[in-house]
Amino acid sequence: MKASETLIVIGREFGSGGRALGRELSKRLSVPFYDKELLHQAAKQFGISLPEFERNDERKPSVLRSMVESAFGMCPANSSNVNSDTLYALQSCVIEKLARQGGAVFVGRTADYVLRNNPRLLSIFVHCDEEGRARRIVKRGDCKTQEEALDMARRNDRLRQSYYNFYTGRQWGNAANYHLCIDLGKLGLQTAVDIVLHATFDLAQRIK
């Protein structure tokens, strides 16, 4: 297998730099990068408004999922009453479709779980100390102060954790659920990129 055929999936703490890592890996491997682009693709493919997806993006639904499996064969086009479970199933369907097209970098959206049985998967979790996360959040303009940034980070982490745990039955951020965990604050972006690339090329050599 070629390294460029690897499916790199990045879970991340809010403000940890996981998206920046994903974009750099995408450039180095010349493969597509999917983050919120997944929402656009899912919305377009299934005829559901983008705001509908964005409202439910990485947020735990208020109802128990009852349609996840069956929804893979559904196309509720233009529905104004599509629930979170169906949106999750449709997004998962898009992830699987994109994975069949070749190598890619996916950020979030439980893509590591959706693709868990794919031998080309390399799953990563990115974390960082709170001070580093706060600095990054302020620098990109999401907040004005460190205190506001920390509050935003913690709130978004709770949402991601609830969403991930609900749909996967796994524990978000638990090292046992990922192939590689990286402290981006300690290692820095370029070192992290080098580590993941090394793992990617090693995985490619071992898969025929």
Give, region by region, the residue ranges found by the protein language model.
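Short beta-strand-centered segment that lines the nucleotide-binding/catalytic pocket of NTP-utilizing
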Residues: 32-43
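ATP-dependent small-molecule kinase phosphotransfer cores
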Residues: 43-103
